[in-house]
Design a protein with these regions (language model features):
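Catalytic beta/alpha-barrel core
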Residues: 40-42, 72-78, 98-109, 123-134, ...
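Active-site mouth loops of central-metabolism enzymes
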Residues: 3-24, 73-84, 102-104, 130, ...
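Short, acidic/polar
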Residues: 18-31, 83-92, 112, 136-139, ...
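C-terminal functional modules
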Residues: 260-371
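Catalytic domains of carbohydrate-active enzymes, especially glycoside hydrolases
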Residues: 22-45, 95-100
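Glycine-rich, proline-tolerant flexible connector loops at the mouths of alpha/beta enzymes
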Residues: 37-60
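Catalytic alpha/beta core domains of metabolic enzymes, predominantly
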Residues: 127-263, 270
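Short, well-ordered coil/turn segments that N-cap beta-strands
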Residues: 3-9, 35-37, 65-71, 96-99, ...
Length: 371
């Protein structure tokens, strides 16, 4: 069974800008239509007075709920303690229909207890990038006392280039949550509208800063440690939204291919006759279609053809010389030598090579023919 991750988007609205509310709502509708389930925003807005944004966040949260999405607010302990000490401001904060409060830094157990008692929350998010394994255990013990309150972990994003985490560090910091079944979220950048003031993307992992959103999401999915992906930059492009949803929600990846001139009708049926489900135990050299041999079993024999060497991104089909493997389709991930038992049937178009890394073992892909 393939892993399914949830996905979310971030917005940092300034509704004093003409048309900002309409633009934000349109963006959230588009995200929801693609399967996104969470909206993230932050009180870390040094450019604006914090108290001035509370009414805007309340309006935003209400719209998020009307869309059927969850609303997450990110704040520091210093900011939240300021609200706790100011009844008037805290009353405004309570008007925000937030589901999750992400505790960034500066929180102490007493302030957490006070907030939980005064806010109607679905749960808390801890800072997955910062806590040690012992701190995770302490937090779990503390939150167990609050019946019904859920706990999630959410990694930082890093606006400044060269400050993001390595994949190894991300995995090390994510593993302590596994024994408690605590979901972990990581962030990826969006390139269409990188967030001010640095405009350098908002990834958790540094090498994702210049990686397209779908590829970054696929790399996080491969770890088996990340349960949710958040596009940290606001107003991601439609293509970015689609490719991240495709990866996270397990939607089939579509690859355009050009066929060899001499392929048989039976080979064509195997190529384009339906979805290809990859085996969960694929080798490093290729993605093996688990469903292709079933397609071949009901058709005519696949005769050998003359082939040169097999190249990365070729689509091959085993012929009758491979006996019971006849009909198996493979998408090559490495160059391989020619084999008289294997027909080269098609080639993935160069424009789609980047999408191949999003096809993980146990997931689906579809081939379409380009003339």
């Amino acid at each position: 069974m393939q892993q399914i991750m949830s996905c979310g988007v971030a917005v940092y609205p300034d509704f004093e800008i003409p048309g900002e509310m309409e633009r934000t709502c349109a963006y959230l509708r588009s995200a929801r239509a693609l399967g996104y389930g969470e909206v993230f925003t932050s009180l870390h807005i040094p450019e604006r007075d914090v108290s001035g944004v509370l009414g805007e966040l309340a309006a935003l949260g209400e719209f998020v709920h009307r869309c059927g999405m969850e609303f997450t607010l990110d704040a520091s302990g210093n900011v939240m303690n300021g609200f706790l000490d100011d009844p008037e401001k805290f009353a405004l904060l309570r008007e925000i229909p937030m589901d999750w409060l992400r505790m960034d830094f500066g929180f102490d157990p007493e302030s957490i207890r006070r907030m939980v008692g005064m806010l109607s929350l679905k749960g808390l998010m801890c800072n997955a990038s910062m806590l040690s394994a012992e701190e995770v255990r302490e937090l779990v013990r503390m939150t167990e006392a609050w019946d019904g309150l859920k706990l999630r972990a959410h990694h930082n994003f890093y606006p400044r280039p060269e400050t993001g985490l390595s994949m190894e560090f991300l995995c090390a910091k994510s593993k302590p949550y596994l024994p408690y079944d605590i979901p972990v979220t990581a962030c990826i950048p969006g390139f269409q509208n990188p967030r001010q003031p640095l405009f350098a993307g908002l990834p958790t992992v540094e090498r994702h800063r210049r990686m397209c959103a779908g590829d970054a999401a696929a790399e996080l999915k491969k770890t088996g440690l990340i349960s949710s992906v958040l596009i940290g930059d606001p107003f991601a492009g439609e293509g970015e939204l689609e490719e991240v949803a495709e990866v996270c929600l397990g939607k089939p990846v579509t690859l355009r291919v050009q066929t060899e001139a001499e392929i048989s009708e039976q080979e064509r049926k195997i190529l384009f006759g339906g979805l290809h489900h990859t085996r969960p135990d694929c080798p490093e050299t290729a993605l093996r279609s688990q469903s292709s041999r079933g397609m071949a079993a009901i058709g005519t024999a696949i005769l050998p053809r003359e082939n040169g060497g097999r190249r990365r991104f070729d689509i091959t089909i085993d012929n009758e010389k491979y006996c019971r493997y006849s009909g198996e389709l493979q998408l090559l991930l490495q160059d391989l030598p020619a084999d008289p038992r294997v027909n080269v049937a098609a080639h993935v178009l160069p424009e789609d090579w980047g999408k191949v890394c999003r096809i993980l073992p146990g997931t689906d892909f579809r081939l379409t023919e380009e003339s």
